[in-house]
Amino acid sequence: MPQWEIVGGADKGGVLVREGQALGSPATKDRLSTGATVEEVELVGERLHYKLVEGTGTGPAEGWISIKVSGKELAVPKEEDVEIGPPGEAGPVEVDEDLKKKIEAEHAKIKDKFELYVPKYKFLKYPLADCKMRIFCFHNAGSAESVYTGPKTPFTDWVKETGKIEMIALDFPGRDKLNKATKHTTIETLAPELLAVCLDKVSDGKPYLVWGHSVGTWVAFEWLILIRKLGLPMPKAVFLNAFPAPHMPVSMRPWHRSKKLSDDGVKEELMSWDSGHFTGAGKVVFDEPGWKDTWLPMMRADFQLYDEYKFKHTGVPKFDFPIHAWHMEGEHFNKKDMIEMWKDWTSGTWDTCAMEKMGHLTCFYNPEYKKQYFTKVVENMKGYYDAL
């Protein structure tokens, strides 16, 4: 029988169970616990007759639940675990012509919205008449492009001094100028959209680098997988910091799935990512009404980008460009060996290190740490720029 996972009800102690299919039938005394697995006996519209899989949760052994309430999922089909493994050896990848046509068609529809996704583009006086290189930046969860484009940093200063580098720092929908856009909860839809909107900036042959942080590394990874499938140029190098490689087994993921967390649980999870930041400058995100109106919905969506991520690239050819993947020494969840798994993804040069004392976010928000972090990134990027 098909199985379902209970993902709703965290704020109420579980999902309401009724004795019969009708919404007016008697409710059971106990609720079905969030995280439980149930077997489908019968599915009628959005009403599920279930039997609880022993040992997976608590609540009535059998009953009826709604799989959705007001558009919010309470139960989702349980997917079979897919074997996850490393890439294969480097080699050619056949162009996916259907995918290419699809991305090109989407580009034609949304290319005029480019500056909504890259809000600093005109402010930084782009496009450049003599652009020599571009740097594509992908931000972390709950953040925005401003972590890269903030003024007077070693990164922005260097880019400005060259006068020949365009910084393409992308916003994910649901923030800044895209505040009213639907937030993505899966990289499978986010990465193609981010490629479509800037396709002409990748396909024109200008050399480029990629810098991703935290979940931005997985978004960048899927973005690069798509670029390769389209037969477009690969980057000169990538910087994928503060997050494990995407082929790390699901069982090794140290964080909690946000779908199963109450609102207070999401707050606790966020705090755990970098308590140094969220007990300091970052604590303002918990102030009301900003927390419930802005930050909580954003975190719930952004967390799912990695919580629910399904890796589907076992055995595909590894890349041949250099990968820099650095660990933040003060991390709570991520460990150095998780970050080092990125080495599996290149046949080229590989670089890793631990950034002393830095947390998952303080590397961006602590002025001293940010200066050190950005200086090191720039020192490495200069080598690729000077070699052009």
How would you label these PLM feature ranges?
Residues 84-92:
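Extended acidic low-complexity intrinsically disordered regions
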Residues 21-27:
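Short alpha-helix capping/helix-loop boundary micro-motifs
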Residues 5-18:
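Short, basic/aromatic beta-hairpin or loop at an interaction surface
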Residues 91-213, 217-388:
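Domain-scale detector for complete catalytic domains at protein termini or as standalone homologs
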Residues 30-74:
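SH3/SH3-like beta-barrel superfamily modules
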Residues 74-85:
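Intrinsically disordered, low-complexity linker and terminal regions at domain boundaries
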Residues 25, 36-37, 308:
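Eukaryotic intrinsically disordered and solvent-exposed regulatory patches
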